[in-house]
Regions:
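Extended non-catalytic accessory segments flanking core domains
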Residues: 1-236, 251-253, 356-402, 441-444, ...
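Residues that flank catalytic or metal-binding motifs in active/ligand-binding sites
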Residues: 58-62, 125-127, 200-203, 329-332, ...
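Sec-exported extracytoplasmic/periplasmic mature domains
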Residues: 4-13, 19-27, 67, 71, ...
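Extracytoplasmic/secreted cell-surface and envelope-processing proteins
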Residues: 12-15, 214-216, 277-287, 296-298, ...
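N-terminal, active-site-proximal structural segment of metallo-dependent hydrolase catalytic domains
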Residues: 124, 174-334, 340, 370-395, ...
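Extracytoplasmic/secreted proteins, especially bacterial periplasmic and envelope-associated proteins
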Residues: 3, 61, 65, 250, ...
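Metal-dependent phosphoester-hydrolase catalytic domains
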Residues: 148-166, 170-172, 177-191, 339-402, ...
Length: 579
């Protein structure tokens, strides 16, 4: 026991004693648990109050009663070799809801949030408690030790103790005991997708496959593989390359089993985060890779995924993309489609979007590749000068990952037989971080509207615009009504930001609205810092929306532990698809 003297100050958001000196040593050999018993981890529900609760106790030991409830599956951060699990106390009302699938922490505007009328912004959900691995690493003398692979709805049956730590803007309890886990309900059975009826219905899906890169070193790409020198905007290390061929194959297998299994093999998938590399083609049912760039205008990883789907008992898929849609590090959006039901139509020079004179009426100057005749086709434009960039931006174009527009014919009874439906699909991957790049993301919505308007003017009534929009559906928003943001420089903008507003105003129907009305407990696609949220959506024109039979989210990723081999076809991505 010692007495110190110093000045209390803040340094990089940490409260510290500076200019500290030792005054005296009062005692030695003190039993820590006797003299300073662990405080109870009972944070207030209000987020601001919860921050004060934790900050006042920074560095102190905490006790968490047995039977705490997991609200976010274990996440793992490779850069720090750390894992984290978010929980709430077992005596919190959320943990005791009658429907076990509602025992989640929903963002404030969600209908199943803990308080307030639906759509309101209220307490910020301060009841969340973060458990991390540093204490376990210290006790095991092994810096690779991770906290147990909890999944959402698990119960931690043992009591936990640990010291309070602050890093990356979060307070966490560095637990000294491994959580003992008992599984709750299976997240994958939370209102899962159903099978489309052959010959009567067809299914579309969005799917962010989370950095689906292979282990091939693309000789035509300077930022593709460890040891490459880098390229403009991208510097080593390239941590999106899988650690081994086995890791890559496991990623493919998990995705394939999901698509062939609980997703029921949708007719058309709008894919995000595939690698743009194209040095391979499929020959006799196997990958044939060489030293020819742009080998067959199909992304290699998605061709390999199509083979894995076939191995998993699914149908045969083909894939297509426009490589102009890739960003600097090689991420691209694309399409996968069943060859027994879906036909990718030939590119038409007269097409209002895919042709050589697209009629996309947008106020920014179109990029040169917009005039290419291609199906699918990436489209982009210069970012207009008047866009508010106070919250940041990516580059000088509207998109860093341009949307892919594809024209498909969906046949009821096989290609070339009977009745068909023509559909335009737009695969989107908007700029990341909902509370940043606000002006740019709003323009990305407006550009989608311009594409749909061009198609509508030409009589193409059926359009689906889907993907990872990286912001929330109405009424959710990164900024509450009246909240100031983007204040550097002044004047501030005032919330809500309504970044998807152009899509709603144009009359497009967000299928999430149907999902949340029918199965609100299942209306989400992502889990961030212990709160579920929706980033992945599909917007439909009225002609397409009229025929909607069902929309469901497949919860076999966001609720399952990362880097855990014990879950088959679970946790293959950090996003859940909608079907």
């Amino acid at each position: 026991e010692i007495v110190l003297q110093g000045r209390v100050s803040e340094f990089f958001s940490l409260t510290e004693l500076s200019s500290t000196r030792l005054v005296t040593v009062v005692d030695t050999g003190v039993d820590l648990d006797t003299e300073t018993p662990a405080d109870e981890a009972i944070p207030p529900d209000n987020l601001s109050d919860a921050y004060r609760f934790w900050e006042r106790r920074e560095g102190m030991r905490f006790h968490l009663d047995a039977n705490s409830h997991v609200v976010a599956a274990r996440d793992v951060f490779a850069s720090t070799q750390d894992g984290e699990v978010w929980v709430i106390r077992d005596d919190h009302p959320i943990a005791n809801r009658l429907n076990p699938y509602e025992r989640l922490v929903y963002r404030d505007p969600h209908p199943l949030d803990d308080i307030g009328p639906p759509g309101s912004f209220d307490n910020g959900n301060g009841m969340r408690i973060l458990l991390t691995s540093h204490g376990l690493k210290a006790l095991s003398a092994d810096n690779t030790t991770l906290i147990a692979p909890a999944r959402t709805y698990d119960t931690i049956t043992n009591a936990l103790t640990g010291s309070l730590f602050f890093a990356f803007g979060k307070y966490s309890i560095e637990v000294e005991q491994q959580p003992i886990l008992v599984n709750g309900v299976d997240p994958a059975l939370n209102a899962p997708p159903l099978t489309a009826v052959d010959g009567v219905e067809f299914a579309t899906s969005d799917y962010n496959v989370e950095n689906l890169y292979d282990r091939r070193d693309d000789p035509f790409d300077g930022c593709d593989f460890p040891g490459n020198l880098g390229c403009p905007g991208v510097n080593p290390p390239f941590d999106y390359v899988p650690a081994s061929e086995a890791v890559y194959q496991a990623h493919l297998t998990d995705l394939a089993e999901q698509i062939a299994g609980p997703m029921h093999a949708p007719d058309l998938l709008m894919i995000q985060e595939a690698e743009d590399q194209d040095i391979c083609t499929v020959t006799a049912g196997a990958m044939d890779c060489g030293l020819t760039n742009n080998r067959d205008s199909k992304p290699d990883t998605l061709q390999e995924l199509a083979l894995a789907i076939l191995d998993a008992g699914g149908p045969t898929y083909d894939t297509a993309y426009d490589r102009d849609g890739a960003d600097d590090r090689g991420i691209v959006s694309a399409f996968m489609f069943r060859i027994d039901t879906v036909e990718l139509l030939p590119a038409d020079a007269e097409d209002p979007v895919l042709g050589d004179s697209p009629t996309v009426d947008y106020r920014g100057t179109a990029l040169g590749y917009n005039a290419d005749v291609s199906n699918p086709k990436a489209l982009n434009a210069d970012l207009p000068d008047d866009v508010d960039l106070d919250t940041g931006f990516d580059g000088t174009n509207v998109f860093t990952r341009p949307p892919q527009v594809g024209h498909f014919r969906i046949w009821r009874d096989g290609i070339g037989l009977s009745v068909f439906t023509d559909l335009y699909a737009i695969s989107n991957h908007f700029s990341s971080t909902p509370n940043a790049r606000v002006g740019q993301r709003t323009e990305q919505s407006a550009y989608n509207v311009a594409i749909v308007a061009a198609l509508d003017s030409a009589g193409a009534g059926r359009v689906i615009s889907g993907g990872d929009f990286n912001v929330y559906p109405r009424p959710d928003d990164p900024f509450a009504p009246g909240e100031q943001y983007g204040c550097s420089p002044l004047p501030c903008s005032i919330g809500p930001s309504d970044q998807l507003g152009p899509l709603y105003v144009a009359g497009l129907h967000n299928l999430w609205d149907t999902l949340v009305a029918e199965v609100p407990q299942s209306a989400y696609s992502y889990n961030f810092v212990g709160m579920i949220q929706t980033l992945d959506m599909q917007f439909a024109t009225s002609d397409q929306f009229t025929d909607l039979v069902q929309v469901r989210a497949g919860h076999f990723n966001a609720d399952f532990a990362a880097d855990h081999d014990g879950d088959v076809a679970r946790g293959a991505s950090d996003h859940d698809p909608q079907v």
